[in-house]
Amino acid sequence: STHYLIINNAWEIKLLNKHTGEITDSPFGELSNAYDLYKDSSGRYWVSFYGQGVKCYNQDGQLLTSYNTRNSNLSNDIVLDITEWDKAIWLATDGGGVNIIYPDTHDIQILSNKENRQFPANSVTCLCHSNNHMWIGMVREGVLGAEKGFITTYTKAAQNPASGLSDKCPLCLWEDKDGRIWIGTDGGGINCFDPQTERFTHY
């Protein structure tokens, strides 16, 4: 494709021509308050609208379905990040934990400390899927590494910096080609986590 779908600083979805830099209207029409955008493995587009839950569109911009607290079991309408794992759509919400949508059945699974007291926080900022893990960034509770049936939490380490984050409020997560997880923090710089050694490097 010669175009990228982008969300501009006015929270509008636009098409960016990667060769010319020209920005034009997207197939989604005039939509406002768009916060995050994700294309899944089936070619569908998932768009979160701030305070309005999430909507799913086909590649022509036709609305397929929508999920919010009024028409579904979604636990919170503020969706900050969207990703996919095994055909399920994972949503990071600001106050409702992680919501997992199974598109084929429209079922929604909730991961929050309301549902499970062992889940550290309900305000989730970011998600990153890596191999058999889902990395979950949580407000003031660090990063949670979730495998199927197993959860590990990494928080700020006071005495041994290499064993924990430099700041326990992650803002973004990214995986590099070597499988390391890079974590942007709110006040602690950038952290790099190596899942093989379970050690952190702070920058």
Write out the residue ranges for each language-model feature.
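Carboxylate-rich, polar loop motifs that coordinate divalent cations or form catalytic acidic clusters
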Residues: 1-203
